[in-house]
Amino acid sequence: RASVLHTSKKLTRAETIFSNMNYENSSEAEIIWDNVTQSNQSFDDFNRVVGGEDAARGQFPWQVLLHGEIAAFCGGSIVNEKWVVTAAHCIKPGVKITVVAGEHNTEKPEPTEQKRNVIRAIPYHGYNASINKYSHDIALLELDEPLELNSYVTPICIADREYTNIFLKFGYGYVSGWGRVFNRGRSASILQYLKVPLVDRATCLRSTKFTIYNHMFCAGYHEGGKDSCQGDSGGPHVTEVEGTSFLTGIISWGEECAMKGKYGIYTKVSRYEV
């Protein structure tokens, strides 16, 4: 995810999802977005999971890693065989993106890995990085070839808007990624995950001088020490309901990582139709 420095710079966690996306046909990917609220806030890019645990192989089979030509930089979630959802701020003009599904340990090749090239990136139509890098921070990525689904490569469940909002209010969610394991530290080689509590909106608003729009939510621990961080952007915030995991948020941004009194900021999936 992206972090915001106290010099007024916001860092992304590499980062968020789509507002009012009407995803009725994966081949057409017709998207309907809300209007962007303008902001003069300035941002810089970053993101990851601090204070988390090593995930078991196949524990989060919807998780993917986004690779540029040099290194990995963001996460994402499998929507179906041909589409991945991530944060819009992860998309850079002219940068070739490779999606790696079935990844667990980034330091060695694994038989569960599947690599696909991104042939089309579709940010939410109201997303405008020059106005606000994290408002409506959500995008879809179309893959060149379908993924082969199995126990290590599986789409995340996405409920309708009403139920997604209800699930989010259950209170706790899981975030995952290969981002930094401590603020400004090294990135994880093994997929990390962390259980984070939802933070009430009033507390969320008081915790930062930056604008928290209605399509964002806060999650994390007041005491600090546990958080998503740089490199985690675009990855999932999921809520488990009777043994089934549903996508409820997209890792977007935050102020540094795991700081006391600060929280991770996520795109609220219930604001968008997939």
Curated annotation (Swiss-Prot):
It is found in: Secreted. Disulfide bonds join 74-90, 204-218, 229-257. One of its GO terms (molecular function) is serine-type endopeptidase activity. It is an enzyme of class 3 (hydrolase). Glycans are attached at residues 25, 35, 37, 40, 128. The lineage of its organism: Eukaryota, Metazoa, Chordata, Craniata, Vertebrata. Factor IX is a vitamin K-dependent plasma protein that participates in the intrinsic pathway of blood coagulation by converting factor X to its active form in the presence of Ca(2+) ions, phospholipids, and factor VIIIa. Residues 49-274 form the Peptidase S1 domain. Its EC number is 3.4.21.22. Ca(2+) binds at residues 103, 105, 110, 113. This is Coagulation factor IX.
